[in-house]
């Protein structure tokens, strides 16, 4: 099964914060400062409150000190009244911004800071980015304690600049099951890098998945209302003590709970194995078997022959190769392990099996189809973004309900390897967009709809989007190929995470992922296949293809 994740590493750093704008005690709105820590190796060192500081200084000091995670934000708590210092929860949320905030003093004891948030992290560690900044007011009420101003009331959470966030927080996935209990599905969470603990990760896991993959898209083995009492780690083994209430889990349930916990905690604090304890009693459950790794070799159509490319070696494919080639494929998805392919041809969308080939969608203007793990083929016309169809291996056709507001055309679609999510690349009047939505199914596994809630994927507005693909076997990251005036850029983004460029290409038209970032491939318009090596794309002149297929 499972373990195909790579946590983002926080940078080691040392920075003394300084140069903050004064906050007025009355009058009109003023603009605060932002600070840039790009390309600096820094540790944030906050200052405690000084004697005689005014309310405005206390608010400014608190906002600054909240970047210091040491000792559970001890310095930040010094700016609060004793009562609030005991209850203030810095983990309630993170407001992330890259533009100055605005400050309004309502009175001597009341101040409101309005943060133009570009993203937020909620109490469960779920990151949500925004296409445009959203104003988030943060109110402060102050009172005197022993003659010194302190904050008596303010919501939980902290405010961070974008660059601070990347240094102070680290990401790791919590794992849930697909509806068939066959694979675990990653759900990225963000935690303070200095304060991340196994207990915090388990609490986030028990809180449930993010909205795009909430049930019925995924499911969890933990009974509703389950809480965690403790997580003890010894010799690489984490013992997770759970309270499942009145429901005593079965051995099957405990086995699945262990799988979710093991995937979510792997390598944190040296954890290599997990024991599940319910009410203080250790439950001895077996380990679920690993999921088979997907193919690594590129599958291509080359001079009328379908085959695999490994290095510069081309080997004709003997399972479905001839049947696929006979359709005149222009793109699509192939599952050699299942003996099944869905390809776009001059006739429309054709499904290829060892025994037959048939056209399942002949509508005009169709884009490349995608294939899920249950054998459903999805198709949609480029210019009709709300007309999705799915057809199963027996030819049963269903309409898939989607909500594509503002979308003018569909560029690419690709189902995740576990069949729980759909990657969509599309055009709008404002520019290209990409997102990942959950696939909602009935109890028989028939796809019914894509979720209206989704993960946003970054695509620069000034580019022409060309293709998108899943990067890794776990389905934790996606990549987008987009063209600007100087060439083609490939951006990789963890779902619920931050985007990063992985190098530039020239004249690319297809992007295909496999098991990890190093297996990402692109086809150029001259037929060359480019492979990623570090942050550089390399091509072998002897390796060329007319079509580069997605594999499942």
Per-region residue spans from a language model:
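Bimodal "functional hotspot" detector
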Residues: 7, 14, 21-552
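Bacterial N-terminal signal peptides that target proteins for export
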Residues: 1-9
């Amino acid at each position: 099964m499972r373990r195909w994740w790579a946590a983002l590493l926080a940078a080691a750093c040392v920075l003394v914060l300084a140069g903050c704008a004064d906050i007025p005690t009355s009058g009109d709105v003023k603009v605060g400062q932002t600070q840039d820590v790009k390309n600096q190796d820094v540790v944030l060192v906050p200052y405690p409150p000084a004697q005689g500081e005014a309310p405005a200084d206390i608010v400014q000091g608190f906002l600054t000190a909240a970047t210091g995670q040491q000792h559970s934000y001890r310095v930040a708590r010094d700016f609060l009244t004793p009562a609030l210092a005991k209850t203030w929860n810095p983990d309630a949320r993170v407001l992330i911004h890259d533009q100055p905030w605005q400050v309004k003093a309502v009175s001597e004891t009341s101040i409101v800071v309005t943060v133009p948030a570009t993203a937020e992290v909620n109490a469960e560690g779920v990151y949500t980015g925004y296409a445009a900044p959203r104003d988030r007011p943060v109110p402060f009420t102050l009172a005197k304690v022993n003659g010194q101003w302190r904050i008596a009331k303010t919501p939980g959470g902290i405010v961070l600049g974008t660059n601070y966030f990347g240094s102070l927080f680290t990401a790791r996935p919590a794992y849930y099951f697909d509806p068939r209990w066959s694979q675990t599905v990653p759900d990225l969470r963000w935690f303070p890098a200095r304060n991340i603990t196994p207990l915090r990760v388990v609490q986030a896991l028990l809180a449930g998945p993010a909205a795009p993959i909430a049930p019925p898209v995924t499911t969890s083995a933990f009974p509703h209302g389950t809480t965690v009492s403790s997580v003890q780690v010894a010799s690489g083994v984490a013992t997770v003590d759970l309270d499942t209430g009145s429901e005593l889990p079965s051995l099957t349930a405990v086995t699945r709970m262990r799988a979710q916990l093991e995937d979510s905690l792997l390598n944190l604090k040296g954890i290599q194995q997990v024991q599940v304890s319910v009410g203080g009693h250790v439950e001895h459950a077996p380990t679920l078997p690993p999921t088979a790794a997907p193919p690594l070799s590129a599958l291509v159509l080359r001079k009328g022959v379908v085959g695999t490319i490994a290095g510069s070696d081309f080997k004709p494919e003997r399972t479905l190769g001839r049947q696929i080639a006979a359709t005149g494929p222009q793109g699509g998805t192939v599952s050699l392990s299942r003996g099944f392919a869905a390809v776009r041809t001059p006739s429309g969308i054709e499904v290829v099996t060892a025994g037959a080939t048939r056209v399942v969608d002949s509508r005009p203007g169709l884009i490349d189809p995608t294939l899920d793990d249950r054998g459903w083929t999805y198709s949609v016309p480029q210019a009709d973004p709300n007309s999705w169809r799915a057809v199963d291996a027996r030819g049963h056709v269903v309409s898939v309900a989607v909500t594509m507001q503002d979308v003018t055309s569909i560029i690419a679609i690709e189902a995740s390897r576990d069949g729980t999510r759909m990657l969509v690349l599309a055009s709008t009047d404002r520019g290209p967009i990409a997102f990942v939505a959950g696939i909602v199914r009935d109890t028989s596994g028939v796809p019914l709809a894509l979720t209206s809630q989704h993960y946003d994927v970054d695509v620069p507005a000034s580019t022409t989007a060309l293709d998108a693909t899943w990067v890794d076997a776990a389905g934790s990251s996606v990549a987008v190929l987009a063209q600007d005036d100087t060439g083609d850029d490939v951006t990789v983004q963890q779902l619920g995470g931050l985007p990063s460029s992985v190098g530039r290409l020239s004249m690319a038209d297809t992007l295909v992922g496999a098991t990890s970032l190093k297996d990402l491939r692109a086809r150029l318009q001259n037929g060359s296949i480019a492979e990623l090596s570090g942050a550089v794309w390399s091509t072998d002149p002897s390796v060329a293809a007319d079509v580069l297929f997605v594999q499942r």
